[in-house]
Structures are given as C-alpha cells and as structure tokens.
C-alpha cells in the first residue's frame, strides 16, 4: 500500500515538500489548504488585472539547490523585459535554459523530465524569471536615505552635519563600549549602529512593525534580518560597488540586506507556486483547497492521522498518514494534537505571538514625490520604501511596477503601489472597512508627500493573518516545543509559521527539502532542519 504524507498548507514549504516527495519517493502527498489561494504569504493576489505581491518576495538565495529549483520552474529571461531598455537595467540574458517537469502520474517511472530550450522572451512568453535591480530606500522627513544606511556625503548632507557628527561619535562609542547583553533587539541594534542612528531610524520603525518595545523583542529577529550587517560594512560595500560589477561573485559573498539584483517571476511569487502546484497535481499529488486540518492524532508516539474539515460543508474526514508536514502556526498545531502534549509545551504554544499584515493597493495615474530640494517626481525606481514618519501608520510602500512591469495591467500609463500596515487581529485597522482603509491610504500617501489623492483610480485591501511569527511573548521558551516536535519522528514542522521563525522563502524551502532527505535516507532525526537560517552568513547551511 502506498505511503501517504499529509501536508498542512500550500505555501513554499508545503509545495516544495510535495514536489520533492513525488520526484524522489513513492510517498503520495496530500496538501490541505484552507483558502482558495496557492502560495500562502507568497501568493499573488489579482485585483482588476493588477497583481499584489504580499510583503514582497525577492528570489535571492545562496543555496544552489534552491536556485536550481526556481530556475527549472521559471527559466531566466533571454530578452529584455518591457522596462529594461527604457530604464537602463543591467540584465544578464540567458541563451539556453533547462526546465524540469515531474513525470505524469500515468508514467511508468517517476523520473524528472528535463527539457532544453531557448531562453524565453518575457514580452512574448509568461513562464519566465526576470532579473531585477534592487533598490530599497528610507523615506524620512521628505528625504530619501539609502537602505541599509551608510554614512556618505549625501546622507550627511540630508541629516545635517551636526547630526552626522553625533551619529559618528555615537557609533564609535558603541564600538568602544558595546553592551554585553544582546538578548533583546535594542542592544543588538545599538551595538551595530550606535544609539543615535538606532533612535533616528530603527527604533520607531521596528516598534511600528511589531507593536511592542524593542527592549521586549528577542535579538534573533535582528540577526536573521540584517545578517551581520553593520554601519562599517554598509560603507565598505558602498565603496566596493564603485570598483566591481561582477554580479554573480559579489552576491554570494554579500549580506542579504545588501544585494543589488534579484530574480523575480514575471507575474509575481504566486506564479512560481502555481507552477509547482500544477506539476504536483499532474504527477498525481492532491491539493485540497478549501479544507483545513483541525486535528492531529498520535498513536505509539507517531502521527497516525489528521482530521480534515471541508470549509464549505463542515464535513470532517479522518485521513490516515505515514508522515505529517505542518506549516501551520505552531500555536494552532499544539492545540489540536491528541493526546495533548505536556502542560509545559501547551503553555509555551499558547503564549506565542504573531504580527498580522494588511496591504492597501492603490492604482495611480502617477506618483507625486515631494522630495526636499527637488521638483515633484512622477516616478521613482524603488521596489520598497520604508516610511519612518511617526505621524502615519503605513510602514512600507511597494511600487509593484518596479518589481515587474507586468504586475500592473497598464504599466505604461499607471503606477500600482501597495501600502503595507503591520497590525494585530482585532485592532482598529484590522476591523476597519475596506473602503475606509483605502481612504486612509489615500490620505497618508498625500501626507508624506508621495502621491496625490486625486490621482488614485482604484483601490483594494488584502489581509494576511499570522504573517510574521513574533520574537516576544513566550518565544524565549520555544525550545520546549522544538524538543517535543523532534520526539515525534514522522512530524516535520517546516516553513515560517511551522517553525515559528522569520524565514525567507528559500529557508522555508530548504527545511522541506531536508525533511524529504530524511525520508529518503530513513533518518528519523530532524534536528538539522532547525539549524536552517540560524547562521549569521545567509543561507550557507543549505548550499
């Protein structure tokens, strides 16, 4: 009888696990996805032909295994995209590509099929990965500042010479007398950037993102998001960029926050995961959308089955399984396991916290960026803009045209942006009506001098619960849960929410790949999965 793996969630980790199982084992994957969307937080949401990337997903990794997976699903572009020539993008065009396909379910063998073909033209074909310039800046007091920050002449001029001098002295003081205890995020940032720069740029924004004080957030979040970056390193990389243009070599050595180019699907991250889902289904895997895992049954120390509820009808089915991959929030998983784990595990799980997220999409005739000392600008080239102003609630702005021109239905005549708000379920923004949120977004882009409300042609709202696992609450005792998970040999917690870790999608994929490695090898020790993304060097563990 064929072995079965139930996979909770059709996001990057869940779909990668299903694809790997079909490619390398005789295990039948059954993905249970409560929504109608594919990709989880990496889905692409479509509103009137305009596409939203929820939170922004750059396809960048130092794992060759992950990169090969991506480029075998969506191959590199072989000709310029719609805006490459107009904006002078420096793009490395491919000539020939190799695509990989799972063999159809009816095939006599399950080998991966490879296809060599000319590299696609994004103006003529859809299945293509674009190479895009990375530009993210901080917008503060109607000035743009580089992200990550480095003290350059331009930055010094915009901050003011006195403020720059005080920032420099503060940084030198932090280097000479670093805080010994880096348990929490405030000390982590101060030791790398100095107190004055921390208070100017990091403190308010970070508390806007998480809704709690930096002194209450564990430093692991900072370590994962800035990857060994410091003010000194930012300055060194800025100088080095003037002397080198070798993209491929420099990217491998570079901290995540400093990458200069990245890969991106023509129609956003959801296109990648819809492609993977199509292959999974074609090879015989199941993806049950509109169904939710509501119970996990243990027997003899292993997962024996899961209870699945069909959301439309309420019908509940018990699905027996040999393996269970969970990408659901750990708090939910622990609460539904029968028999229940120890009170210590349940207590830690109940205390885990999450930050929720909503995006307000605005379709504009044009931008109207009021930068000090410049005439109003109708466009800027940023992918993301970090909004530091304390007087508005928006945290970031995405300009979707700059991720891929094809995200905007009419990229030549409109600008499609997303205002990102970090919220909690039940707070005023989360409960606000969509029409009121669109009006708030219109007011705020005008207030910060980024666009005019009169230029807004359309708007929409997209909510994403449990988007970011938080490094406060009971997180300091998370090892209690990890030890419990690893004691169940056929339970694999993978992905961002599955591990309660702020992973990028490549890290989430690696955890799924490594879990399947264990199944192939007959290994029941999954401790290696929990080392992915712990290193200060980005992604080296999976290379």
Spans of features found by a protein language model:
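Dinucleotide-binding Rossmann-like beta1-alpha1 core, especially the glycine-rich loop
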Residues: 48-175, 227, 231
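C-terminal lid/capping helical subdomain adjacent to the catalytic/cofactor pocket in oxidative enzymes
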Residues: 450, 460-462, 471-543
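Active-site/ligand-binding neighborhood in enzyme catalytic cores
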Residues: 143-145, 152-155, 159-160, 164-299, ...
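Glycine-rich FAD pyrophosphate-binding loop
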Residues: 22-47
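Mid-domain catalytic core of redox enzymes
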Residues: 24, 265, 289-431, 435, ...
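Conserved mid-domain beta->alpha element of the FAD-binding
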Residues: 179, 322, 326-333, 428-437, ...
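Conserved Rossmann-like nucleotide-cofactor binding loop
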Residues: 13, 37, 331
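N-terminal Rossmann-like FAD-binding beta1-loop-alpha1 element of flavoenzymes
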Residues: 3-31
């Amino acid at each position: 009888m064929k072995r079965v793996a139930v996979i909770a969630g059709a996001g990057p980790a869940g779909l990668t696990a299903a694809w790997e199982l079909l490619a390398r084992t005789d295990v039948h994957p059954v993905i249970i996805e409560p929504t109608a969307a594919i990709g989880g937080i990496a889905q692409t949401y479509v509103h009137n032909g305009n596409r939203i990337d929820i939170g922004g997903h750059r396809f960048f990794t130092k794992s060759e295994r992950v990169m090969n997976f991506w480029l075998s699903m969506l191959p590199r572009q072989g000709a310029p995209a719609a805006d490459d020539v107009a904006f002078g993008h420096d793009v490395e065009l491919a000539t020939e590509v190799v695509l990989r396909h799972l063999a159809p379910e009816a095939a006599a063998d399950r080998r991966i099929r490879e296809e060599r073909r000319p590299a696609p033209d994004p103006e003529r074909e859809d299945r293509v990965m674009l190479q895009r310039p990375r530009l993210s800046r901080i917008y503060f007091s109607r000035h743009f500042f580089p992200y990550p920050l480095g003290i350059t002449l331009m930055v010094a001029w915009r901050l003011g010479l006195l403020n720059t001098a005080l920032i420099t002295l503060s940084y030198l003081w932090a280097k000479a007398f670093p805080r010994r205890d880096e348990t929490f995020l405030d000390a982590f940032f101060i030791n790398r950037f100095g107190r004055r720069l921390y208070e100017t740029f990091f403190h308010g924004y970070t508390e806007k993102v998480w809704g709690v004080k930096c002194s209450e957030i564990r430093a692991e979040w900072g370590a994962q998001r800035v990857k060994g970056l410091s003010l000194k390193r930012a300055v060194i990389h800025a100088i080095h960029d003037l002397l080198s243009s070798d993209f491929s070599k420099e990217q491998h050595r570079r901290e995540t926050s400093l990458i200069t180019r990245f890969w991106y699907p023509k129609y956003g991250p959801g296109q990648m995961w819809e492609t993977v889902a199509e292959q999974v289904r074609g090879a015989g895997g199941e993806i049950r959308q509109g169904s939710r895992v509501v119970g996990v049954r243990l027997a003899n120390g292993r997962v024996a089955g899961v209870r699945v509820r069909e959301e439309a009808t309420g019908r509940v089915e018990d699905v027996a399984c040999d393996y269970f991959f969970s990408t659901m929030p750990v708090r939910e998983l622990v609460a539904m396991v029968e028999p229940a784990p120890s009170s210590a595990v349940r207590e830690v799980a109940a205390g885990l916290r999450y930050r929720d997220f909503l995006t307000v999409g605005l379709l504009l005739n044009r931008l109207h960026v009021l930068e000090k000392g410049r005439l109003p600008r109708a466009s800027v080239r940023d992918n993301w803009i970090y909004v530091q102003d304390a007087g508005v609630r928006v945290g970031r702005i995405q300009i979707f045209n700059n991720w891929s021109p094809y995200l905007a239905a009419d990229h030549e005549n409109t600008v499609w942006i997303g205002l990102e708000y970090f919220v909690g379920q039940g707070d005023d923004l989360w409960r606000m009506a969509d029409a009121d949120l669109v009006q708030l977004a219109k007011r705020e882009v005008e207030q910060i001098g980024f666009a005019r409300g009169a230029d807004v042609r359309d708007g929409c709202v997209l909510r994403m619960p449990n988007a970011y696992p938080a490094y406060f609450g009971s997180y300091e005792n998370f090892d209690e849960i990890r030890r419990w998970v690893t004691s169940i040999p056929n339970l694999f917690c993978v992905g961002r929410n599955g591990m309660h870790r702020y992973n990028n999608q490549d890290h989430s994929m690696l955890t799924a790949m490594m879990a399947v490695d264990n199944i192939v090898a007959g290994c029941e020790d999954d401790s290696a999965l929990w080392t992915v993304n712990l290193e200060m060097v980005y992604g080296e563990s999976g290379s």
